[in-house]
């Protein structure tokens, strides 16, 4: 089957609810650069069908940073990391709520509360419950997602009772590869936590990290594992190779392949909220706006230990690509018109007619 027929088949199956084949998913990942826009256009047909032109903004709040006992090889907060990240213990509920409020003011519809560590103690869950309460009191309509690691019995239910709407725990990579990136817990531990969250009434959120040296087959494996797990939202991260981590020298991606990965995830999980997540700025670069034709969600602002694109630049990007921000009273185009990130014309003061070198 040629690629055009494969893409038509993927769209048809995405509409009818039929699962694609592994060969079809692999064909997307292995397609040529000449076919990239065809791949994106086909993925957009599913994105538009299920999500229109809306973009959901999510905002991360790192409640506790660094000093994690787990050895996840991609993570700047891992055991033994000498990356110069911020390290601090639990934020007070009012501090976390104030930080969340800034993201909500910037357009975020969901706040993601994250804490480093293997998993929370019951006292930690109490702390997070207080933080959820503080956020919900100030912003009753905002969604709150918790991401605290592996959960013990009853903790998911406690978070749900406190007002949490969702729980994130990423699969990250294929089950057969998981031991290559982490030895202190297992792939099945992660699956169990996502299922525990679902059983407690929390919306499950689980995604991947691409660029860790995995094969195309590994990427397809984890995409189909997510289809089976059926999370409501799927964050797609691209490895940020932090110096001081075992994967600090891994630069395996380019913008075109990132778009193909996003499209493959969309084809395999057509009705899920696919979120463009960590690493988008450094790996997609100027092709970020094109990714909005595949994904329907992004993180606004900074990540847990690294800086992201400026929030007003995110709004500008969404507006210029012709999309709207979900949940706002006005769309991103109107926000741009009101001056969000609007730049004045810069008068040339270099090159010909000056003593300064030209911009070349």
UniProtKB/Swiss-Prot annotation:
Family annotation (InterPro entries): Aldolase_TIM, BATS_dom, Biotin_synth/BioAB, Biotin_synthase, Elp3/MiaA/NifB-like_rSAM, rSAM
EC id: 2.8.1.6
Cofactor entry: [4Fe-4S] cluster; [2Fe-2S] cluster
CC cofactor note: Binds 1 [4Fe-4S] cluster. The cluster is coordinated with 3 cysteines and an exchangeable S-adenosyl-L-methionine.
Keyword set includes Iron-sulfur: yes
Binding residues for [2Fe-2S] cluster: 112, 145, 205, 275
Family label: Belongs to the radical SAM superfamily. Biotin synthase family.
Function: Catalyzes the conversion of dethiobiotin (DTB) to biotin by the insertion of a sulfur atom into dethiobiotin via a radical-based mechanism.
Domain Radical SAM core residue range list: 53-280
Associated pathway: Cofactor biosynthesis; biotin biosynthesis; biotin from 7,8-diaminononanoate: step 2/2
SUPFAM superfamilies: Radical SAM enzymes
Keywords: 2Fe-2S, 4Fe-4S, Biotin biosynthesis, Iron, Iron-sulfur, Metal-binding, S-adenosyl-L-methionine, Transferase
Reaction(s) this enzyme catalyzes, per UniProt: (4R,5S)-dethiobiotin + (sulfur carrier)-SH + 2 reduced [2Fe-2S]-[ferredoxin] + 2 S-adenosyl-L-methionine = (sulfur carrier)-H + biotin + 2 5'-deoxyadenosine + 2 L-methionine + 2 oxidized [2Fe-2S]-[ferredoxin]
GO molecular function annotations of the record: 2 iron, 2 sulfur cluster binding; 4 iron, 4 sulfur cluster binding; biotin synthase activity; iron ion binding
Protein name: Biotin synthase 2
Subunit and interaction comment: Homodimer.
A GO biological-process term: biotin biosynthetic process
Protein's gene: bioB2
Residues annotated for [4Fe-4S] cluster binding in this entry: 68, 72, 75
PANTHER family tied to this protein: BIOTIN SYNTHASE (PTHR22976), BIOTIN SYNTHASE, MITOCHONDRIAL (PTHR22976:SF2)
């Amino acid at each position: 089957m040629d690629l055009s027929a494969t893409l038509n088949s993927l769209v048809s199956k995405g509409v009818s609810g039929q699962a694609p084949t592994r060969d079809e998913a692999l064909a997307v990942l292995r397609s040529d650069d000449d076919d990239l826009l065809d791949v994106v256009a086909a993925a957009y047909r599913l994105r538009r069908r299920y999500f229109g032109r809306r973009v959901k903004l999510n905002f991360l709040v790192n409640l506790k940073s660094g000093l994690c006992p787990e050895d996840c090889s991609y993570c700047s907060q891992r055991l033994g990391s000498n990356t110069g990240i911020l390290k601090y213990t639990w934020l007070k509920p009012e501090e976390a709520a104030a930080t969340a409020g800034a993201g909500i003011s910037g357009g975020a519809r969901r706040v993601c509360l994250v804490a480093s560590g293997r998993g929370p103690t019951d006292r930690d869950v109490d702390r997070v419950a207080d933080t959820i309460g503080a956020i919900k009191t100030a912003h009753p309509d905002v969604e709150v997602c918790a991401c605290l690691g592996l959960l013990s019995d009853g903790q998911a239910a406690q978070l749900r009772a406190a007002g949490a709407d969702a729980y994130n725990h990423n699969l990250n990579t294929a089950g057969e590869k998981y031991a290559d990136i982490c030895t202190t817990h297992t792939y099945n531990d992660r699956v169990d936590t996502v299922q525990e969250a679902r059983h407690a009434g929390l919306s499950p959120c689980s995604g991947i990290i691409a660029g860790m040296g995995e094969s195309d087959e590994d990427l397809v494996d984890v995409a189909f594992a997510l289809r089976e797990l059926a999370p409501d939202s799927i964050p797609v991260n691209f490895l940020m190779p932090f110096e001081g981590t075992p994967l600090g020298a891994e630069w395996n991606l380019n913008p075109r392949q990132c778009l193909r990965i996003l499209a493959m995830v969309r084809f395999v999980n057509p009705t899920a909220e696919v979120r463009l997540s960590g690493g988008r700025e450094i790996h997609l670069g100027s092709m970020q706006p094109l990714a909005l034709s595949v994904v329907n969600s992004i993180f606004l602002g900074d990540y847990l230990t690294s800086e992201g694109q400026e929030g007003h630049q995110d709004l500008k990007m969404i507006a210029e690509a012709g999309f709207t921000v979900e949940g706002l009273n006005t769309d991103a185009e109107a926000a741009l018109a009101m001056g969000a990130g609007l730049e004045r014309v810069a008068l040339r003061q270099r090159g010909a007619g000056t003593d300064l070198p030209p911009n070349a």
